[in-house]
């Protein structure tokens, strides 16, 4: 599993740089603008400069509306600013067809600029609360649009978590569908270290966290700390090893 950590600015990105050996992707977002809140282009550039060159930078485009042209232009802005991974939260898309239209525009915009860009179509485990596309439709949306990964997060940060809305067995189906489509499967949404056993069991490719590596476990008021990143990674790797050993014995 790959570990994606989401600092909210340059200062936290520098702390991520201190823990670079323990993480795989640095994700730029603005938590006070939503689950996948987009940060400023200059912040993406500054974070790209702050973290080691071998660590890819991801940037969220936002919890986006159904406005394909607007979203495509925003996604290109993230790519031009230095992000390799481009994440789009399909917040305002009520149907799979709308979501595919939005993501096709994003894929064309960013891959015309940078062929190796990695596009992530992100939905929400709590989609029923906001009226957007069903979580299990995301892998097919990603496949049809030419995206590289399907992701689930939570839209409303009120203390509920990924597994509160999409139980582990349903997340396993999400991962299976993504893999069947030739995509990576990413899961986030107030993930804690106690969830890592299930995430390893269902063969999640990317785990995204913020609160779990912040002081006090608070994604908004807490700050990312290198020792918390290291501890989370150690626990994640332990579960991956245990799952691999169990699978080899079965």
Swiss-Prot record:
Coiled coil, from the record: none
Catalyzed reaction equations: 2 D-glyceraldehyde 3-phosphate = 4-(hydroxymethyl)-2-furancarboxaldehyde phosphate + phosphate + 2 H2O
Top-level taxonomic group: Bacteria
Keyword Chaperone annotated: no
Active site, renumbered: 29, 87
Keywords of this entry: Lyase, Schiff base
Principal EC category: lyase
Any one GO molecular-function label of the UniProt entry: lyase activity
Keyword field contains Lyase: yes
Protein EC: 4.2.3.153
Family: Belongs to the MfnB family.
Role played: Catalyzes the formation of 4-(hydroxymethyl)-2-furancarboxaldehyde phosphate (4-HFC-P) from two molecules of glyceraldehyde-3-P (GA-3-P).
Protein name per Swiss-Prot or TrEMBL: Putative (5-formylfuran-3-yl)methyl phosphate synthase
Organism: Streptomyces coelicolor (strain ATCC BAA-471 / A3(2) / M145)
């Amino acid at each position: 599993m790959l570990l994606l950590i989401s600092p909210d600015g340059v200062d936290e990105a520098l702390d991520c740089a201190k823990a670079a050996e323990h993480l795989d992707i640095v994700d730029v977002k603005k938590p006070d603008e939503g689950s996948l809140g987009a940060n400023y282009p200059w912040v993406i550039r500054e974070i790209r400069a702050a973290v080691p060159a071998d660590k890819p930078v991801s940037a969220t485009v936002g919890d986006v509306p159904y406005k394909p042209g607007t979203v495509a232009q925003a996604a290109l802005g993230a790519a031009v600013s230095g992000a390799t991974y481009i994440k789009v939260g399909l917040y305002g898309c009520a149907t799979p067809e709308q979501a595919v239209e939005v993501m096709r525009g994003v894929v064309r915009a960013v891959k015309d600029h940078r062929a190796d860009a990695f596009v992530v179509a992100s939905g929400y485990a709590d989609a029923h609360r906001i009226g957007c596309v069903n979580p299990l439709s995301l892998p097919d949306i990603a496949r049809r649009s030419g995206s590289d990964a399907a992701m689930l997060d939570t839209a409303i940060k009120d203390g509920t978590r990924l597994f509160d809305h999409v139980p582990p067995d349903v997340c396993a189906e999400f991962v299976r569908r993504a893999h069947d489509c030739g995509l990576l499967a990413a899961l986030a949404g107030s993930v804690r270290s106690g969830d890592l056993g299930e995430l390893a069991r269902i063969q999640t490719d990317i785990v995204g966290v913020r609160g779990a590596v912040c002081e006090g476990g608070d994604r908004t008021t807490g700050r990312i700390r290198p020792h918390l990143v290291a501890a989370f990674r150690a626990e994640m790797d332990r579960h991956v090893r245990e799952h691999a050993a169990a699978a080899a014995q079965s």
